[in-house]
Amino acid sequence: MKNWKKAIALVASAAALVSVAACGSSNAGGSSDSGKKTVGFVAVGPEGGFRTANEKDIQKAFEDAGFDLTYSPTQNNDQQKQIQAFNKFVNDEVDAIILSSTEDSGWDDSLKKAAEAEIPVFTVDRNVDVKDAEAKKAIVAHIGPSNVWCGEQAAEFVNKNFPDGANGFILEGPAGLSVVKDRGTGWGNKVASNVKVLESQSANWSTDEAKTVTAGLLDKYKSDNPQFIFAQNDEMGLGAAQAVDAAGLKGKVKIITIDGTKNALQALVDGDLSYVIEYNPIFGKETAQAVKDYLDGKTVEKDIEIESKTFDAASAKEALDNNTRAY
């Protein structure tokens, strides 16, 4: 089917070819004018330090590997724009699609189209929840760190530092995202029975929103002596730290965050944060290699987990002093 369409494309009008090139897409059949394999990257777009580092790393890795990658970011977690970009890549008959989804559901129809067109899909960072059996066939592999592991590390830090139990809060990302669910699952897997979460609220990955939410929670639960805040990303943790400082509680409330950006590590060194769990964004090479291997007919692992680490103040200072952080 794809070969037949490619033959038709070779006799298409020059105007049509110019139109396709102008919108940054591939020619029918999957190969660009340069002869490179074409890849469509359905991306989240601007969303903080992790996202910027991750998406730049993926783009660079595919360029270095000799692919013709088209980057299509959305804005404000707009899933409909992502779906439109995904479907356009299918219609353009790219050789592969990289999907970093804003939502974990709602992808069945698009993935089914990709499966029918025999276009392999590689999910990165966030998993998608697919019900349709045909749609599932499109997904070759998932590449990214383990969000469950990150949540488990947060719980184990609280358990270790509060063996007699503690009260605290959880600041979550936007509702419905697999990353939010998985980090919450990890927390639940490991947290001790004498650790009480007074309330969980979404602060939508935002520093400003987290500052406001945390200030309200600290006031609401003042009599419960909150001792920890688990923020599901660095930006929210930094906002929580501002609220804790404003309330005169710096050093009395431990703040745990996930991502491992330079700003968070510096805040850890400065004593504003207590523990930072890395969610390693640098896996462009692994993603490009998985796509290349699959297109070359090789077997690819279904779940390619990227290793991450944890930081206390000492290891954060070492990482910053050595300038080893890419984000």
Curated annotation (Swiss-Prot):
Residues 1-22 form the signal peptide. GO terms for cellular component: plasma membrane. GO terms for molecular function: carbohydrate binding. It holds the Pfam family Peripla_BP_4. PROSITE patterns: PROKAR_LIPOPROTEIN (PS51257). Disruption phenotype: Mutant is unable to grow on fructose as sole carbon source. It is found in: Cell membrane. A lipid is attached at residue 23 (S-diacylglycerol cysteine). Disulfide bonds: none annotated. Induction: Induced specifically and reversibly by fructose both in a time- and dose-dependent manner. Also induced by ribose or xylose, but not by glucose. The keyword Lipid metabolism does not apply. SUPFAM superfamilies: Periplasmic binding protein-like I (SSF53822). Keywords: Cell membrane, Lipoprotein, Membrane, Palmitate, Signal, Sugar transport, Transport. A lipid is attached at residue 23 (N-palmitoyl cysteine). It is a lipid-anchor. Part of the high-affinity ABC transporter complex FruEKFG involved in fructose uptake. Can also transport ribose and xylose, with lower affinity. Binds fructose, ribose and xylose, with fructose as the preferred substrate. The complex is composed of an ATP-binding protein (FruK), two transmembrane proteins (FruF and FruG) and a solute-binding protein (FruE). Belongs to the bacterial solute-binding protein 2 family. This is Fructose import binding protein FruE. The gene is fruE.
